[in-house]
Amino acid sequence: MRTFSPKPSDIQRQWHVIDASDVVLGRLASRVATLLRGKHKPYYAPHVDTGDYVIVVNADKVVLTGKKLEQKRAYRHSGYPGGLRSIPYSELMAKNPARAVEKAVKGMLPKNSLGRRMAKKLKVYAGPEHPHQAQKPVPYEITKIKQPA
């Protein structure tokens, strides 16, 4: 049996909008990564970008469980020797909450050119507004599982 490869004409991209308020960060990221990869579609193929566009709003209201807000750190490297920088997630969420969501989702995508192309279809906004009304995004519901602190 030959490997199925969807043609570009077969792929229909849709826009989804997700409200991230009171949703656990990891659960949100895994659902978003599935939509970006296209694994929810019947013609999914791992070597083809069949995914949809995803808009995440209210990224500043996303929840980290346990003590992760104080203990977990976000790392980045400049590429130079000794260029590793880290900040706690509490500081990252205060400064740039959209970056925290992007970082979580990108960690769940493939680490190659296909994954980078998929990541470009992710749009994250800290507030409730987004400039993509013309694309007519469809609301995508994620169960709010905010666990007690």
Curated annotation (Swiss-Prot):
GO BP annotation list: negative regulation of translation; translation
Recorded GO CC terms: cytosolic large ribosomal subunit
Coiled-coil boundaries: none
Keyword tRNA-binding: no
Alphabetic keyword roster: Ribonucleoprotein, Ribosomal protein
Ribonucleoprotein as UniProt keyword: yes
InterPro entries cross-referenced by the UniProt entry: Ribosomal_uL13 (IPR005822), Ribosomal_uL13_bac-type (IPR005823), Ribosomal_uL13_CS (IPR023563), Ribosomal_uL13_sf (IPR036899)
Domain of life: Bacteria
Subunit-level organization: Part of the 50S ribosomal subunit.
Entry's family note: Belongs to the universal ribosomal protein uL13 family.
Official protein name in the record: Large ribosomal subunit protein uL13
Species in which this protein is naturally found: Thermobifida fusca (strain YX)
